[in-house]
Amino acid sequence: MKQKIKSRLKKDNWLRYLSQTVAVCFLLLFISFFIFLLIEAAKTGPDFTKSLLGLEFNLGAKKASIWFPLLVSFVVSIGSLIIASYIGVRTSIFLVYRCKPRIRKKLLLVIDILSGIPSVIFGLFATQILSSIFRDVLHLPPLSLLNVIVMLSFMIIPIVISLTTNALLHVESSLMTVAISLGENKTSVIYKVIKKEIKAQLVVILVLAFGRAISETMAVNFILQSVNYQEVIANDRFFTSDLKTLGSVISTFIFSENGDEQVSGVLYTFGIIIFVLISFLNFFAIWSTRPKTLERYPFLKKISNFIYQVVWFIPNNIGALFTDLTARRQQVKKITAANVEQRATFFKERMQTNHLNKVYTSWKILQEIFCAVLAFGFVLGILLFVFINGSQAIQRSGSTVFSFGVDTTGRALVNTLVIILVAIGITFPIALLIAIWLNEYTKSRIAKNTFSFVIDSLSSMPSIIYGLFGLSFFLRTLQLSAGGANGTSLMAGILTISVVVLPFLIRTCQEALNNVSWDLRVSAYALGVSKREVIWKIVLPGALKGLIIALILTINRIIAETAPFFITAGLASSNLFDLSLPGQTLTTRIYGQLFSTNSTAVDVMLETALVSIVFLMFLIFLSSYLIPYLFSFNKQKWLQIKSKLQLWKKA
């Protein structure tokens, strides 16, 4: 009897020990990630180290001031954040309060498409379309910081819209009902009550969107080319210049011909600065909005208010002007027997107030419609640009979509598919085990908070930092390349992208497990079912739909990435196909054409962009429609379909 109990305990505990071991290894990965960055950054020479806090940037002269690239990064990020927050929040209000749920669901799918578009396609659109608008319509330099601000604003709009929409949908409906019953109109309630109710969430959204903007690298490289910071700033042409951001400086000089070990150390130092900055922003956003934190540190409310006021300075002042114009200033508040002779004045003032309230409401709705048209119009514009021009490029004689040679789009697609299959095979079991341990086994709040912070930090990490880690660890240390420490390989790209998507996959798997009703677990435990059996027979089957969607979203993320592959897998494919040899993906094929002197470079970009967009739209269709539709079928429906198929075969 004792032996049976022991054997059953061993069977029950093996999953716990395995998942716990994998979780600890993941934590060690995070620590080693930072250590390898520090080791490479330590190679910075004394001359470069002294110049980091100086005001001169010239890598050839061993001058590497951090301030100018960081200033450019902050300026373009704040500029894009102001535009994106204005458009995004008003579009969210339009979706939640002006659209029916069915229409809202379809429009949010369009936003999902925008969020899934690879950054290199944004860069291509900016150089081909936005640059023409700046040059021909606005009569401004086509490739400038202003172009980058507009491009980045539409890149971060999906974050603002999706998170703000989610926050608005979770506001208690009683707030709207009570305020309207007190005499306020719907629009006034939205902007004066509900918007203030989600103010804390809006600050978090702004911080997350800012982190996304400041970490963008590859799209920015399509536009910004200069590092002559002192000359440009001295000539007072900052916004019309093409000065590089901090992230684009890293990607530009990481494989520079004149780059040595010290230059590489400087770039790793820049990467650590971005890493620390993004981690701090995410930690501050989550920590500062907790009720207990706000009670203990009241000054955090002032900081949140300051961030909110800076970003919303112009919209708030315009809104305050209209509020002032439409404010009630009735001299006669109420008609009684004592002032019945003033009834004419009372009705006149009330009609004027109602008219001004209608003006206020119309102005707000007009802004919402305008912002929604801008957001969805941009998606339509970029899709039409890719489909029309990409289709024309494919029809030309030089198209390589259906070729699989060395320098072809077909070969890039094959490389991308191989990377997806191997990376998913590596990351999914690891992510699922960690999610099971966090969700089903561990009871420690400290452990959960620690892993939550690590996962959030790694999820928000700029992909260029992962590329630096892959270069340092997989190529220079493990030498997973046929070319040795100085080479690139598909295997290094696969392992690097596995590290990139692992935190995202852990979080989505955890959400899928959380969506399984806890009542099912409790009922099973009450019947004497072991935890291992509950996980295998109840939790995992119940979470199957969410896990499949998590896999599809992860594949989407892999396709959209560029920076990790650019650094670890290379910009070109080798003559032979081998995981130890370099190979370009769809996105690095687009990016690689920036350095090509071939006259067909733009056509190659367009045809590859079309293949990428079609692939991504297919995945979004799977995750948003097909998978939920299939899982909505019950057993009886499947039997009906089976019987119809059998009858069809007999006929």
From Swiss-Prot:
Q: What is its main location?
A: membrane
> Which terms under GO biological process does the entry name?
phosphate ion transmembrane transport
Look up the domain of life of the source: Bacteria
Q: Where in the cell is it found?
A: Cell membrane
Q: How does the protein associate with the membrane? A: Multi-pass membrane protein
Q: Which Pfam families match?
A: BPD_transp_1
CDD domains linked to this entry: TM_PBP2 (cd06261)
Q: PROSITE patterns given for it?
A: ABC_TM1 (PS50928)
Q: Which ranges does the record mark as transmembrane?
A: 22-42, 64-84, 107-127, 143-163, 203-223, 266-286, 368-388, 417-437, 451-471, 486-506, 535-555, 613-633
Q: Name one GO cellular component term.
A: plasma membrane
- ABC transmembrane type-1 domain: from which residue to which, for each copy? 70-285, 413-623
- Keyword annotations of the record: Cell membrane, Membrane, Phosphate transport, Repeat, Transmembrane, Transmembrane helix, Transport
Q: Which InterPro entries match?
A: MetI-like, MetI-like_sf, Phosphate_PstA, Phosphate_Transport_Permease
Q: Does the keyword Transmembrane helix apply?
A: yes
Q: Which SUPFAM superfamilies match?
A: MetI-like (SSF161098)
Gene Ontology MF: a single term: phosphate transmembrane transporter activity
PANTHER family recorded: PHOSPHATE TRANSPORT SYSTEM PERMEASE PROTEIN PST, PHOSPHATE TRANSPORT SYSTEM PERMEASE PROTEIN PSTC
Biological role: Could be part of a binding-protein-dependent transport system for phosphate; probably responsible for the translocation of the substrate across the membrane.
The similarity annotation says: Belongs to the binding-protein-dependent transport system permease family. CysTW subfamily.
- Name of the protein in its database record: Phosphate transport system permease protein PstA homolog
**Source taxonomy lineage?**
Bacteria, Bacillati, Mycoplasmatota, Mycoplasmoidales, Mycoplasmoidaceae
Q: Which gene encodes it?
A: pstA
